[in-house]
Regions:
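Exposed, interaction-prone extracellular/peripheral surfaces
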Residues: 5-13, 22, 31-70, 74-256
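N-terminal low-complexity, intrinsically disordered segments
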Residues: 16-26
Length: 256
């Protein structure tokens, strides 16, 4: 039980909860009110599809996602809460149930860090639907992905009615602002389709950057529409730092 507030005594309140110091100052009985502490449950969905294997000059996107997944789970289990993991590509591949403790965290970390981005195409619907069933009693669902698929918004809305949702889009700098390196053959790792693009053209790079910005803004709007949050992750930056900064901003916002 966690202390919440002190309020005037009303008939039916337990005498053992009377705050005698406040009662003496106020001149009439006051009681302490407690709120039941609920165990936090965190489920991380980690995208292990082929697009996650992309790596420019930094580490592969799946490495960044795996590090974020482990960091989130470590923060939860450190406080005695439960954490779980689903890895997926076009379907759920690995399931680590919701548990706590250092041994469980080690098992979860091994599962996350063993991902190589070698799966098939991306489908967010199966893991989101499984998360909705698993987390029916509420909790936090964090999704680490590059979100390179369509058709999952309605499933996310259903999840958002039950849980707090955290979207962690993973981006490589070259995907956001490609360097002017001339002709580049760009290949979709999931479909195999490729296209020759002239990255030395300012117009091409501007269109590319505009499209990347548009995807980021769309994802932010999606999260806000369900009361969720977005923590952008970049492969050339520390994922743990990004997550810590997010929660520090949230804590400051609650204090104002």
């Amino acid at each position: 039980m966690a202390f919440e507030e002190v309020r005037p005594y009303t008939p039916g309140d337990e005498v053992r909860f009377i705050d005698w110091n406040v009662t003496a100052r106020a001149g009439d009985p006051h009681v302490k009110v407690f709120q039941e502490e609920r165990e936090l449950r965190l489920l991380v969905l980690l995208d292990d599809s082929a697009s996650q294997s992309f790596a420019g000059d930094a580490e592969a996107k799946i490495r960044t996602g795996a590090h974020a997944a482990v960091a989130l789970a470590a923060a939860a289990t450190r406080g005695g809460d439960r954490a779980g993991l689903l890895t997926f590509d076009d379907k759920v591949r690995t399931r680590i149930p919701l548990r706590s403790g250092p041994g469980h965290l080690l098992r979860l970390a091994r599962a996350a860090l063993s991902c190589r981005g070698e799966g098939r195409g991306t489908d967010l619907v199966p893991p989101i639907e499984e998360a909705t069933r698993t987390m029916a009693g509420g909790g936090i669902v964090a999704i680490c992905s590059d979100f390179q698929c369509d058709g999952w918004l309605e499933a996310l809305r259903r999840l958002g009615r039950r849980c707090e949702v955290l979207l962690l889009p993973i981006m490589d700098p070259a995907e956001v602002a490609p360097p002017p390196v001339g002709l580049v053959r760009v290949q979709d790792p999931e479909s195999g389709a490729s296209q020759l693009i002239d990255m030395s053209s300012p117009g091409v790079r501007e269109a590319w950057e505009s499209a990347a910005l548009g995807r980021q803004q769309e994802l932010l709007a999606t999260a806000r529409s369900i009361g969720g949050d977005v923590v952008p992750l970049r492969t050339d930056q520390d994922a743990i730092d990004a997550i810590e900064r997010h929660y520090q901003r949230r804590a400051r916002g609650r204090q104002t």
